Amino acid sequence: MESLKRWNEERGLWCEKGVQVLLTTVGAFAAFGLMTIAISTDYWLYTRALICNTTNLTAGGDDGTPHRGGGGASEKKDPGGLTHSGLWRICCLEGLKRGVCVKINHFPEDTDYDHDSAEYLLRVVRASSIFPILSAILLLLGGVCVAASRVYKSKRNIILGAGILFVAAGLSNIIGVIVYISANAGEPGPKRDEEKKNHYSYGWSFYFGGLSFILAEVIGVLAVNIYIERSREAHCQSRSDLLKAGGGAGGSGGSGPSAILRLPSYRFRYRRRSRSSSRSSEPSPSRDASPGGPGGPGFASTDISMYTLSRDPSKGSVAAGLAGAGGGGGGAVGAFGGAAGGAGGGGGGGGGAGAERDRGGASGFLTLHNAFPKEAGGGVTVTVTGPPAPPAPAPPAPSAPAPGTLAKEAAASNTNTLNRKTTPV
């Protein structure tokens, strides 16, 4: 049931995307067709001109048309015949030249124009009609890009380029329309502004150009929207594929999280999770094994080498004295790691061995040795040993040691040998 619902949702989403692409394609070619019709037809403007009149009540018409004599004070000026014009030609609807079309002359010979003036530049742009033509070309290219995007669906940049072309075509179209209106409003003539407004109107070619502008902007927005949706879908699909690949690799014994780590958004989260999980999996530090005794601070579990510390040789006499003192009691320990002496005369031998170590270890106080095994679960083992003590004459054996003296001496010698295992951090 869930799979059917998901299939219906995907189908509805695909239909919606297909409708958007279809509307964009149809709108692109419709806008191109409207702009082409507007450029090629001569119904942008309806006005009256003297070139189409049959009679001219004034004497000496500038356009060379016939005039009716009289020359009295009751002479009236003929407004001229009705004409329709486009970007290139003007055609007569009335008068003697009815149905005749002539090319528009934007620069009459009897008019002197300053080449640096704004009016001259406006007439040049109006005569060339470069902006409407550029708009039509951009619309055609945009329509081709939309059609190509339906074939090459994996290349999302094509539909983005089409949207940019449509927006640029709309801007070029509206600039051309503004230039055309400005050129007509600035047309020189003897009429006042009120009379000019009553003697010209815009035709259906002009409105076709305006409709082409609206369509170009709408389909430009649609094309950009399609590009955004496709990019979002591709991004989500890539994320889901990586997550599936990571889950499959993790289930089969591979490195599952490695695929997820390729995603920038999951990189930091995974590091934080791995750190927290490693901290939670570490054993709690043992209080008994802590260097500071119960309640002392713990240290992280790591691979640290064993360090052997050698003591100052000047302190070897203390160990020798302790060893000699324990000779009579039997069992006094040697200096800094010497084995415990045997009962009776074994203490003297232990003292001699300690003296030999004191003589050989006079090189310094601390000596670093990199000889220790690395264990995954172990901590740091620190062994403190003393150098061999110089030979000393054996002291006379005491007759009767006081109660508790031997135990105190043994405890003092035991403190010179440290073999501690630090707790993991």
Swiss-Prot record:
Palmitoylated. Probably palmitoylated by ZDHHC3 and ZDHHC7. It is found in: Cell membrane; Postsynaptic density membrane. GO terms for cellular component: AMPA glutamate receptor complex; dendrite membrane; endocytic vesicle membrane; glutamatergic synapse; L-type voltage-gated calcium channel complex; plasma membrane; postsynaptic density; postsynaptic density membrane. Residues 343-354 have a biased composition (Gly residues). The modification Phosphoserine is found at S252, S255. It is a multi-pass membrane protein. Residues 412-425 have a biased composition (Polar residues). GO terms for molecular function: calcium channel regulator activity; channel regulator activity; ionotropic glutamate receptor binding; protein phosphatase 2B binding; voltage-gated calcium channel activity. Residues 272-304, 343-365, 377-425 are annotated as: Disordered. One of its GO terms (biological process) is regulation of AMPA receptor activity. This is Voltage-dependent calcium channel gamma-8 subunit.
